[in-house]
């Protein structure tokens, strides 16, 4: 197979990374995609760093077996815990991670706090500390750990009273006029954006790193002359460690494919 026609591998702790792959498909519809969701081991955000690193390496190995030309670690927690180690081990393949879109949030230049919703591990890791050091001095940044949110989404709960109550409780300390921007620091969270807007004002920007990551993926492929030159729509393959048809169906629903 021509190197350019080989698929791009995406990996996440579950269905969350589909929000990133969706952006990549919009940007590069002619590429072929393989998505590996590790729902069997979700959520990653409450595991130890070593556990997450082991699971990340396992996922990367399984994608390499599928002969992928690039890998997107479409999981904030896995990026925080393992991306540098993964890149060191697999130097010959582009490996792209994802980070909370803090830089983008600062460009909105709105009064109020920049609230970063993320898993507890993402907020504890050095990568996030570096972002805080870079932007924390000039902006009011609030870390909002949302440990249970991934579980809602993994169960296909994207709306409803229970989810709304959970989000209300999380945002209880903050009035709407105290919030400048909300950053979704976990790839699962874009799927509950509409429900979040039932809890906070609709004029508050809610942003995530999906588009920026997809643009970086495209740049890296271009740099290595790996962009697919076919004009037809590419293929999409979804694999999930959970092994159930239900997870595949949920994944297809989230990415709106048949």
UniProtKB/Swiss-Prot annotation:
The active site is at 75 (proton donor/acceptor), 186 (proton donor/acceptor). Pathway: Cell wall biogenesis; peptidoglycan biosynthesis. Substrate binds at residues 12-13, 44-45, 76-77, 187-188. One of its GO terms (molecular function) is glutamate racemase activity. Keywords: Cell shape, Cell wall biogenesis/degradation, Isomerase, Peptidoglycan synthesis. It comes from the Bacteria. It catalyses: L-glutamate = D-glutamate. One of its GO terms (biological process) is peptidoglycan biosynthetic process. Its EC number is 5.1.1.3. The keyword Isomerase applies. Belongs to the aspartate/glutamate racemases family. PANTHER family: GLUTAMATE RACEMASE. Provides the (R)-glutamate required for cell wall biosynthesis. This is Glutamate racemase. It comes from Clostridium botulinum (strain Eklund 17B / Type B). The gene is murI.
């Amino acid at each position: 197979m021509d190197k350019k026609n080989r698929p791009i591998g995406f990996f996440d702790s579950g269905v969350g990374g589909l929000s990133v792959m969706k952006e990549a498909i919009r940007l590069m519809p002619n590429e072929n995609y393989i998505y590996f969701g590790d729902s069997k081991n979700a959520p990653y955000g409450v595991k130890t760093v070593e556990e997450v690193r082991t699971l990340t390496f396992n996922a990367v190995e399984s994608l390499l077996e599928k002969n992928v030309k690039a890998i997107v670690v479409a999981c904030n927690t896995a990026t925080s815990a393992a991306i540098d180690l993964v890149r060191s081990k697999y130097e010959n393949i582009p490996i792209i991670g994802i980070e909370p879109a803090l830089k983008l949030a600062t460009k909105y230049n709105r009064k109020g706090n920049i609230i970063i919703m993320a898993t507890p591990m993402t907020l504890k890791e050095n990568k996030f500390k570096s972002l805080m050091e870079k932007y924390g001095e000039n902006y009011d940044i609030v870390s909002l750990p949302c440990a249970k949110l991934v579980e809602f989404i993994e169960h296909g709960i994207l709306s409803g009273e229970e989810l709304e109550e959970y989000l209300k409780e999380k945002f209880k300390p903050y009035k709407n006029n105290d919030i400048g921007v909300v950053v979704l620091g976990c790839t699962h969270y874009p799927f509950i954006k509409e429900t979040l807007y039932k809890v906070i004002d609709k004029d508050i920007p809610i942003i995530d790193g999906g588009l920026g990551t997809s643009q970086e993926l495209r740049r890296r492929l271009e740099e290595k002359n790996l962009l697919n030159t076919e004009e037809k729509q590419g293929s999409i393959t979804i694999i999930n460690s959970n092994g159930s048809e239900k997870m595949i169906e949920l994944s297809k629903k989230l990415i709106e494919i048949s």
